[in-house]
A protein has these predicted regions:
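Aromatic- and Gly/Pro-enriched helix-to-coil junctions and flexible linker segments
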Residues: 20-127
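Sec-dependent bacterial lipoprotein signal peptides
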Residues: 1-20
Length: 127
């Protein structure tokens, strides 16, 4: 009788362990950013914020919530509000704030973050 209880218990534990699943999240592969090639703000960085992908400009527009991320004002806004830290680029708020609790839908992709980080490391030029 005791053996059947042990077998039953082992079978139940086996079923319970098989019921648990975990979906592995595949990490995004980063295309290497060549630090010797200048990253252009106007064509590579600004579109991340001004395109409709994250809908940043639905709130962050002229007369709306700061910073003003419209095409004409995005560079000045990022600098005026000190969202770019050229001393410690990885600590720049422009990298750490999107994706926070108040902006959970706006998480930058790993490749976008890497591109912005490299641009800041290159001096965050308005080119």
């Amino acid at each position: 009788m005791k053996k059947s209880n042990i077998y039953f218990l082992l079978a139940m534990i086996g079923l319970l362990l098989n019921a648990c699943t975990y979906d592995f999240i595949v990490k995004e592969e980063l295309a290497p950013v060549d630090p010797t090639v200048d990253i252009l703000f106007a064509t590579q960085i600004a579109p991340i914020f001004t395109s409709n992908q994250y809908q940043c400009t639905s709130c962050h527009k002229t007369g709306g919530q700061a910073p003003d991320l419209t095409v004409a004002n995005v560079y000045n806004s990022l600098n005026t509000l000190k969202l770019i830290d050229t001393t410690t680029p990885a600590s720049s708020k422009i990298l750490t704030f999107p994706g926070s609790a108040s902006h959970s839908w706006a998480k930058l992709s790993a490749s976008e973050s890497q591109l912005i980080l490299t641009w800041i490391q290159q001096g965050a030029k308005n080119n």
